[in-house]
């Protein structure tokens, strides 16, 4: 499974490399903000300048992936074929490795048959193939860490080894440095673990404190760096209110309308340049809160649309939107089918005596996307949930076939 998954993604990477060599907007498609920050690191200016001009230190993104891209640039020479292929190869490796936790997660919660089918399904999973081989971004690494986190959380339910808690804390710390949104389910999963281990008569408080200390030790250097750079407590990143502003500004022509982001709006970019990063983020907070207070109905309506978009891929049938997004309708059918199969698989498992095993995964499915409902949603943002979705999609199909055969 692993080698097939890797080969498919590497083949797509080889085809997609020319896309990243386009000099449009100074190689903007080469990692977007992450590519700009990586170049700044290589040029000796540090973790800075996420947009088009030098703008000083930034905390708009977490550090792990930009430094990874910077390492590739340092080795292979900036925006080159070799650099693009190196980054895409790493993406492909991360995505292919995700087969392993997918297999063991399915085996632990469901059964061996589902684990094998889910592993092979992941090898050919379109979103994973595209996000690994068709984008220079952190999606594949984020998904790998997420799937390892989900698996390690389940292992802790009955584990007596302190080392498992250390690994858990380290994984959460790594998640914070790669994609802080992964930390969303942490308090809910921690409560679930405390309840489950208490029922089993197993210790949870001190091992949990130790895991929390490991997490803090992993992210602390980055938090200290942010405080020194901005004289403000910024634990991991500072872009939350900008993302809220993008989602709630009155423009629903797209999930992320061009009029609301500094990379696509001359007005927003001019404000960024004038105020600096911290001033800009403060301004977006003020603007977003004011707009939401003045338009509560709009906030509720767009939030509902974000929920629908997260689980079906659907946003709009406006001709101008569809012209810019030619795969929107096919993707909507595919994403909706995946969600329906997910619901079916969860139902089969829950009613089939696996409710306790399934519950923490349901908890993740509910809590992880919450931040995207109140900012803006996207299929790539949902990618950390895709291992769980693929597992239960496969289980739904297999269980339906088994029951149909039993009735025949």
Q: What residue ranges belong to the model's regions?
A:
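Loop-to-helix entry region of an early transmembrane alpha helix in multi-pass inner-membrane enzymes
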Residues: 59, 63-67, 77-100, 119, ...
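Extracytosolic helix-loop segments that constitute the early lumenal/periplasmic catalytic or substrate-binding loops
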Residues: 10-23, 30-57, 64, 71-72, ...
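Membrane-interface anchor segments at the N-terminal boundary of transmembrane helices
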Residues: 86, 93, 284, 290-291, ...
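Membrane-proximal stem/loop segments at transmembrane-domain junctions that anchor or position
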Residues: 227, 233-309
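Membrane-interface transmembrane helices that cradle and orient dolichyl/undecaprenyl
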Residues: 109-113, 141, 149-167, 171, ...
């Amino acid at each position: 499974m692993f080698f097939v998954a890797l080969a498919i993604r590497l083949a797509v990477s080889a085809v997609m490399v020319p896309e990243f060599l386009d000099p449009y907007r100074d190689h903007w498609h080469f990692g977007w903000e992450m590519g700009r920050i990586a170049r700044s690191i290589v040029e000796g200016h540090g973790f800075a300048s996420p947009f088009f001009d030098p703008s000083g230190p930034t905390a708009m993104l977490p550090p792990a992936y930009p430094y990874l891209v910077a390492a590739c640039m340092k080795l292979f020479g900036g925006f080159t074929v070799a650099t693009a292929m190196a980054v895409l190869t790493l993406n492909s490796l991360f995505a292919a490795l995700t087969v392993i936790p997918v297999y063991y997660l399915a085996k632990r919660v469901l059964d061996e048959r589902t684990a094998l089918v889910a592993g092979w399904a992941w090898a050919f999973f379109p979103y994973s193939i595209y996000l690994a081989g068709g984008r220079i971004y952190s999606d594949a690494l984020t998904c790998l860490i997420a799937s390892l986190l989900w698996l390690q959380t389940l292992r802790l339910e009955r584990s007596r080894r302190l080392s498992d808690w250390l690994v858990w804390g380290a994984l959460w710390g790594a998640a914070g440095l790669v994609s802080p949104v992964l930390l969303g389910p942490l308090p809910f999963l921690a409560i679930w673990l405390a309840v489950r281990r208490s029922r089993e008569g197993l210790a949870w408080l001190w091992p949990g404190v130790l895991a929390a200390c490991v997490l803090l030790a992993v992210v602390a250097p980055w938090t200290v760096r942010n405080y020194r750079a901005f004289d403000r407590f910024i634990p991991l990143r500072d872009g939350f209110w900008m993302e809220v502003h993008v989602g709630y500004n009155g423009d629903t022509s797209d999930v992320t309308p061009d009029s609301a982001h500094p990379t696509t709006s001359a007005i927003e970019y001019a404000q960024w340049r004038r105020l600096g990063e911290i001033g800009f983020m403060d301004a977006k907070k003020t603007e977003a809160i004011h707009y939401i207070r003045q338009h509560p109905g709009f906030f509720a309506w767009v939030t509902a649309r974000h929920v629908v978009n997260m689980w079906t891929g659907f946003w709009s049938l406006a001709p101008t939107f569809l012209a810019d997004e030619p795969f929107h309708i096919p993707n909507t059918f595919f994403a909706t089918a995946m969600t329906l199969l997910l619901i079916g698989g969860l139902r089969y498992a829950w009613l089939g005596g696996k409710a306790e095993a399934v519950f923490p995964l349901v908890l993740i499915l509910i809590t992880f996307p919450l931040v995207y409902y109140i900012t803006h949603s996207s299929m790539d943002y949902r990618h950390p949930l895709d291992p769980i979705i693929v597992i239960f999609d496969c289980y739904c199909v297999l269980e339906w076939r088994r029951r149909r055969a039993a009735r025949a």
